[in-house]
Amino acid sequence: MHIPDNYLSPATCGTLVTAMAPVWTVAVLKVKVQIKKHHETLPMLGIAASLAFLIMMFNLPIPGGTTAHAVGGTLLAVLIGPWAACLALTVTLLLQALLFGDGGILAFGANALNMAVIMPFVGYACYRLGQKWHHEKLGLAIGAYLGINMAALVAGIELGLQPILAHTASGAPLYCPYGLNITIPAMLTAHLLVAGWVEVVFTLLVFQFVKRVAPTNLYQTPTRRNQRPWIALLLGLAVLSPLGLLASNTAWGEWSPQELQQRLAQQHISTHAPQGMVHGFHFQALFSDYAIAGLPVSVGYILSAITAVLIFLLLIRGLQHETDTSQH
């Protein structure tokens, strides 16, 4: 689901990040109002971002030799509201790209549109319909499933349009080499068959956990929120995160230029990777692929998870201190 750099043309990336700018602006304004009404929203933003980050570390094997993962977009929308979920997921995606090389820097707008807008808003709309019809959990499950699959569909469209939008004079693709007839089925198959159902399971389990141990931690409950169950949940997920390493293959559409070149050669499509990808923007993250030099992969994975959680919580603590200071 995380589109790397050089799979989308610079024009596509620029268009999508420009389209996201007003969405982020509205989200910030909406969340500021929400925080004024319910101060507990601010610390929950850090918890929500941490939760999404950890959920996305659990990669799953997909038939055909690729992987996929859940995201938690609908879950976050139910916990803190869709606009706050948009911001939490945006910050999560930004940290993943900058620190861990998961998702592109230039493709950040595309990934934010898919996972921080489409997923939480589609999922939350289904959840609210379920509530209206007195089938809360059913609405939540449908929202989680539809949300991630709608995001996958849009990602497939973004990738599949590239051979049409950006190509050489001879018609060779400059960026993603696969057309819509390949990208859409590839993205949807992985999410319809596997990732969508795991998204449902994660969403229902955490929702049930919250309803049981901290029912005030839901968006529509304007009472003081207990953070202790969340800290326990986050620590548990961080410790279990190396399970995501069991699926070692690369997710569809996230290959390096070298991996893509091998695939294209095996499929008798081309003997080289697209030129725009080979000569495009390349960013080396500090802890690329959640690995820390000199440490076992599983240990690096856990430390990456804990580092991300600490960054989110410290960031929110700083914002909370600044908010409290300005109010006094």
Swiss-Prot record:
Subcellular location: Cell membrane
Major place of residence: membrane
GO terms for cellular component: plasma membrane
Single biological process term from Gene Ontology: nickel cation transport
Pfam families: CbiM (PF01891), PDGLE (PF13190)
Superkingdom, natural source: Bacteria
Induction summary: Induced by L-lactate but not by a racemic mixture of DL-lactate. Makes part of the larR(MN)QO operon.
Topology versus the membrane: Multi-pass membrane protein
Membrane-crossing segments per the record: 8-28, 42-62, 75-95, 103-123, 138-158, 187-207, 229-249, 296-316
Keyword Transmembrane helix set for record: yes
Alphabetized UniProt keyword annotations: Cell membrane, Ion transport, Membrane, Nickel, Nickel transport, Transmembrane, Transmembrane helix, Transport
PANTHER family the UniProt entry points to: METAL TRANSPORT PROTEIN HI_1621-RELATED (PTHR34229:SF1)
Subunit structure: May form an energy-coupling factor (ECF) transporter complex composed of an ATP-binding protein (A component, LarO), a transmembrane protein (T component, LarQ) and a fused possible substrate-capture protein (S component, LarMN) of unknown stoichiometry.
Family classification: Belongs to the CbiM family. NikM subfamily.
Role this protein plays: Probably part of the energy-coupling factor (ECF) transporter complex LarMNQO involved in nickel import.
UniProt name for this protein: Probable fused nickel transport protein LarMN
Species the sequence originates in: Lactiplantibacillus plantarum (strain ATCC BAA-793 / NCIMB 8826 / WCFS1) (Lactobacillus plantarum)
